[in-house]
Structure formats: C-alpha cells, structure tokens
Amino acid sequence: MLSAKILQSSGFHRKQCPLCKSYFWTRRADQIYCGDQPCVPYGFIGNPPARASVESLADLRERFLRFFERNSHVRIRRYPVVARWRDDVYLVGASIYDFQPWVTSGAVPPPANPLAISQPSIRLTDVDKVGRSGRHLTGFEMMAHHAFNYPDKYVYWIDETTQYAYEFFTRELGIPPDEITFKESMWEGGGNAGECFEVLIRGLEVATLVFMHYEVKDGRYVELPLKIVDTGYGLERIYWLLKGTPTVYDAVFGPYLAKARQRLGVPEPPAEVMGKASVYFGQMDPEVIGLEKAYDIIAEKIGVDPKWLREVVRPQEALYVLADHSRTVSWMIADGVIPSNTGAGYLARLLIRRILKNLRLAGVDAPLVELFDMHLAELKREYPEVWEARGLILELVDMEERRYREVLKSAPAAVKKALEEARRRGRAGLDADDLVALYDSQGIPPEVAAEVAKSLGTEVKVPDDFYAKLAARHVKREKKPESSPVEMGKVADLPRTRELFYEDSYMRSFKARVLRVIDGRYVVLDQTAFYPEGGGQPADRGVLKFQGGEAKVVDVQRVGHVVVHVVEGQPPPEGAEVVGEVDWERRYSLMKMHTGTHVLIQSIRRVLGSHIWQAGAQKDIPSSRIDVTHHRLPTAEEVARIEELANRAVQADLPVYAKIMPRNEAEAKYGFVLYQGGVVPAREIRVLQIGPDEQPYDVQACGGTHLRSTGEIGLIKIQKVERIADGVVRFVFTTGMHALAYVQELERRAAEAASIAGGSRDELVEAVRRLAQRAEEADRRARRYAELYAAALAENLKAEQVGRHRLAVVELDDEELARKIALAATSRDRDLVLVFVGGGRATVYTGGVDVAPIVKALREVGFRGGGSKTFAQGQYKGDIQTLKEAIRRALA
C-alpha cells in the first residue's frame, strides 16, 4: 500500500477500482472508479475544473517553477533533447534522463538538491496515436521536481512529494480537492524503478510521482543506495486540462493550427464533434480494435455518418501530426540531429515522413518548408535556440521533402518487385516484415506500399502501430562489446596505475616497478608513461628495459583502473625495476594529430554550423580522420575556409591545457558540447581547452595526450573529404611533417603532370585544358569512325538462312561496337537474329523476332541470362557451334 500523510489528513480514502483492480485515493465517497482511462471518460472537455486563469504554456511553466522555488527548490536550466551524456539512448524521454546514470547511481552529485526543471522530452512509443487520440504527443515538456536522498542526507520522500502535488494543483491552480485522484501504480524506466502515484483529474493523468529506490538488474529489483523523488508534471496535459479544448493540440498549438488551416484550406471542425470524438478515442485502443472500426464505433456513439466523420476528422489529424511532429523535429535539428538512416537521424526522418504521409492522405498540399517556417515563428519566443537554427531546419526539411517525392516516384516498381518476391516464396501479399524492409531500404511508407499493392490487385494490411515499432528499433544506442587483453579478475586486486602520461605528456622515459606479469606477455607496472589506446588515439609503443633484458611494447590497453602493457620477447620478472622508453617520434606525431583533431572539429563547426557533431575519429600516422554529422558534402570553398581557419589557430600558437573538473561544474560552464568525442564515464572529467579562458577556441572532455600549444602542430592539411554514410561526412587530414611530406608529394606530382602535358607547373591548368580539348575531339572522331566501321560490318555480315529467319553469329568482345553493329543491321533486316559471343558472355539482337524461344533453347546449353522481346544477354561459357545449333532448333 502506498500512502501519504497529506492524503489521510485531507480526507482521502483508499478504494479499489472494480474495472482495472487498481487502488486509488479520493475524497469523494461516491467515486467508484479509479479516475483513469479507459475506466472513466474525460470530464474536462468544454468544462475545465480550475478557478485559476493561465494565459499560456509559458505562464503555467513559470507558475510551476516559482511554486517550487518558494518551497526551497533550485531552478535549473533545461537540458538538450539529445542525450549526449549517455551511451544507451539517443533522446531525452523524461527529466530523470538528465540525471541517469551518473546521479542516480550515486557517482556524481546532482546540480542541486532538491531541484525543479521543465525538460523538453521526446517519446515515440505512441507515435501512431499522435493526431488520433487527442492526447498523445511525441514532443512535450516534463515539469518536474527531484530530490536525491542519500544514506547520510535525507531531503524528502513520499509525504512531502504528495503534499507538493496536492498544494500545487489546489492552491496554485485552484482545482477543487474533490477533483483530484491519486492512483497507486509501479513505474520502471532507464534501468530504475519504484512505486508511484498517478495524479488524475477528470479522467486525465496530469502528473506522476515516482519514488525510485530500485535498480533493475536481470529482471530483478535491487535496492539503490539512493532514494530518488522522480516526478513528472505534463506541461501540455495540464494546460489542456485548464483550457478544456477538444484536443491537447488545440490547446498547445492553437494559433499555429489556425494559420495552417487557412494556408491549406482546411475548415475548422465542429468543436462539439471533435470534443466527443476525443472523449471516445481516449477510452479505446485503435491498435486493439483497429482504426477503421474505431471510427465506426465513434460515429455510432456520436450519431453521425462514419464517412462524414472520417472526412471531418482526418484532415484535422494530419494538421495535429504536423503541429506536433514539426515542433519535435525542430527541437532535434536545433540540437544537432541530421535526418538520416541511422541513430537519432532515423527518428527525425521518420517524423518528417509521417507529416508528409498524413498530409498526402488527407489530400492537403503545401511546401513543407513553408509550414515549418510558420511554426518556427510561433516557437521562437519559447525556444530561441530553434529560431537560431531556422536556416538549417528549413534547408533539411526541404531536402527531406524532395527525397520523399523521389521515393513516391520509385514506389510502384519497388512494391511490384517486392510482391513478385513474396509470391515466389509462396505468400499472397506483403507482411509487416516486407513493409519494414521497404521503408528501411527505400523509404517507402507502408500506406503507399498498400496503395500500390491494391492497384495491382493485392490487399495489404498496415499495422496500426507500424511507426512505433520502427522507432522502438532505433531509440537505443548500440553498445559495442568491449574487448580486453586480460580478464578484469586477474588485475582487480592491483592498485590503480599512476598515469605519468597525464602528468607530463612530453615524458619520454620513466622508471617503474613490475607489479604483475600475466601469461608471459602482459605486464602491469606501478606507473607508466605509455598511453593506452582510447578515444580514437592508438596506444604508444616502445621498450621496457630491465637488468638482463629488454621487451618490446607493442600495445597498451586499459583494464579497469590498471594499464596493461603487451610485450614481445622475454618479459621483465615481477618485482623488477624497469626503464620504459616511449617511441617519442610516433607519440609526438600522434599528439599533433590529436590536438589537430580538436582544432579541426572546431573549425568545421565554425564554417558549417553548430549542428556539427563528431560521429567518429581515428588518430593515426601519417593520416587521421574525423567523421562529422552533416547533410551534404561541403563545397571546395567551405573546405578551403575550414583549412584556413584551422591553420590560423595553429599560427596563433594558442595555449593548450588540461584540467580536472567536477562533472556538474564542467557541464554548467561549457555545456554538452564537451562530449564531442563521446561519453566520459566519471565523477570528474578531464577538460582539454585550446585558447585562453576569456576566449577559448575549443573545449572538450578528452583523455588523450596533447601538445602545449597549437603552434607545435606546424600545419594542418585536409587531404580528402567524402560522404561515408547518409548524414555523415569524413575529413581525412594530416599534420606536422606528415602534412609537409604530403604537400611536397602534391608538388612533385604537379611538376610531373606539367611535364607530361608539355608545360611548366605554373601553366599546368592551361596545359591540361588543351589536352582535354584534344581528347574530346579525338573521342568524337573515334565515335564517328566506330559508327562507320559498324555500318560496314553490318553490311557484310555473313548470315545463314534458317527457315524464314537469317542467323549470324559473330565472335566479338566489345559491347559498344556490338551494339552499333546490331543497331545498323537489325534496322534494315527485321528477320535477322544477330548473336555476339565473347568474354564468357552471349548477346542476342533481333530486328523483330521474339527472343523468348531462343533464350529457352540457349538455357538448355548453359546460357544464364534474360532480356526483353528483341534482346537478351547473359553468361555463356560453351562453344559457338553448340550455341548455333540451339538457336537453329529454336528458329526451325
């Protein structure tokens, strides 16, 4: 039983719902049901319960935050919607995500305790219900207050949390106590769990009060050392309750919906019909009974024609989807997400395509970029970061719409091919897996696939939760399995290795004591200057010298808190004193590459935009690479500007220094751009800063070895820029003496090319242009000579009469010449069958003779291929005589 003092002292009684069997607390003696859907209908539509007047979402948000500030909470800024600090999920799905796993595990203290926040969040669990149910959103703000209770520090727990909720709704918002129900439940998410109260008012869940004290391990609940108050008050839900509009979309997006309706020519629906439809939709699950059946049931309950209801509701659903999804996508892009086929980009593209799909099915049309721009104008006051990203958002939305149009053009052929493949496998039509494959591989929405299939005489059922299932496959990050040269158990008892490479990155040699030798080749020292592989930087190499011997260090890896050296040759004995010597030339080159990587990523961001995020990196010799999120290949001018900016930073000889900072302090000072290189799992993080404190050039959390100043890099040269995946661009670059060697090699090749072209290096461009003109003229002449030669050969073909047809077989391994000969010969002789054999292939041309019988005969002698009515080609390894005889039989 979950209880609280405020409930008992305020006249609440515990009851059990006869329908769902849940326990709940209410002041009303006549309340029978739990107050949640589907047990009760909405009772606030057209009849809001609050006395307080709330003007806007901003007003409601401010009331909430001020209420908790008055109650000794610290207001903190909202976090981004992309969870850069986590390695398990892409998007923030609730305010508690901001503090998982570091704060909830006890590894890092919270930024304040207790605290209050209003956190933009994204959940695609119910994406298929958005627009239909009247209440579901993909993007929403979760207002929350959190308290973190430690074994030695109690803040507050169930009693105080419940009292805050009661007082906020009754005193701050003026909702009568009798309207509020507290329903007992259990919550689980993000690896944690706990009992909870769901706060319900007139059938609508407006808040959840979670008392988190479990960690979920292998399906079991394990007590956490912390007891965490995790609350969630739905900003949009509460605002809807206070406004009493037919749907949450009308309350939250009212001004935008009015503009969108006017632009698209969609009439405003009857409020009474939409209100009743919303009430009934809220009490049923279309995924269970089917969407079309749900329309029929609701139409009957309202007393209207089902067809009329669909005609009224569906355009509104499309607008609701547009309003919700466009805000969510704008949040994502403003936070650095590029629509693509992977990761968070996949989810952004999915939402954009759902907008386009719904608008198309509703029969309304306008450039999506225009509809987005209208919404951005509405959002700019609440979310200034979205307005700042307006140019990028509109560019990406326009690109996505053009791609979608191309997808629609290619859909008929792709769906037809998929249907043929399904039939070959013994199935009559397409199943859910086929629809997923068509969407993931070619971007074809299932509704479009169903339309095409229907036009071909096949009915295809689209699952009502199709997009939710797609999203569920992409919301979590894939964790790469970690490999280790040594089992953790073999070094767990050893003390932490002193990491001299952090104390002095320029240390070339050092003395140390051997703590353990494992399997004759893994050496653990008490301290080391050898850098272990990590963060895209390769491990150091070198030697360990000891009395009576020397071992070559070929690899270095971190295993927990210990650094393990992989050696070749006889290892030093345990307890021995050794002298470690780092391959300094290699290490120094890698330091230049690593510091150069930081300079380059910041230069890329400054030229291409703040949406640039590192998607991977590898520092190596003689070249390194960095992969970044970007929607197109940068122009030559942009690459030149990036390179120039990077080398200006090198010339400025900016100071480079690392400092250890508490995680919260670093995040508060620099933001989550710290994690360009990925998540850093530590209470304290090593922050690498380039440039002075008053104007740093770049700041990142980084565990690599670096230079003292950018001047030591010498030169940064971009060697290649390529698009390696949808939404990912790779920069290959080099630094220092390797960059000089690369430039010198380019100079040598330029001089050699100039010599071949017949000019000096300064005249190379003009010389190449002349050569290109000559080559073009020679190519024109060659094509003309080939046509004349083909025509001559066509006239002199030796063909034999086979029945009423003429057959000619020619040995020729030149496809282009064969095509020209065939074109000339078959255009003047419709009864000609012309076959070219060579290079393990056979090609058949005819003037008008059907090749089907010929192909059938050829397959009997080893031909593997096919074609059209008058053309066939494929593999043929046999002899010419056998081929001739097969064709003669076919023509006889």
From Swiss-Prot:
Q: Which SUPFAM superfamilies does the annotation name?
A: Class II aaRS and biotin synthetases, Putative anticodon-binding domain of alanyl-tRNA synthetase (AlaRS), ThrRS/AlaRS common domain, Translation proteins
Which Enzyme Commission number(s) are on file for it? Answer: 6.1.1.7
**Example of a GO MF term:** aminoacyl-tRNA deacylase activity
Q: Which SMART domains match?
A: tRNA_SAD
Q: Which cofactor does it need?
A: Zn(2+)
Give the main EC class: ligase
Q: Please identify the protein, giving its name as recorded.
A: Alanine--tRNA ligase
Native organism taxonomy? Archaea, Thermoproteota, Thermoprotei, Thermoproteales, Thermoproteaceae
**What gene makes this protein?**
alaS
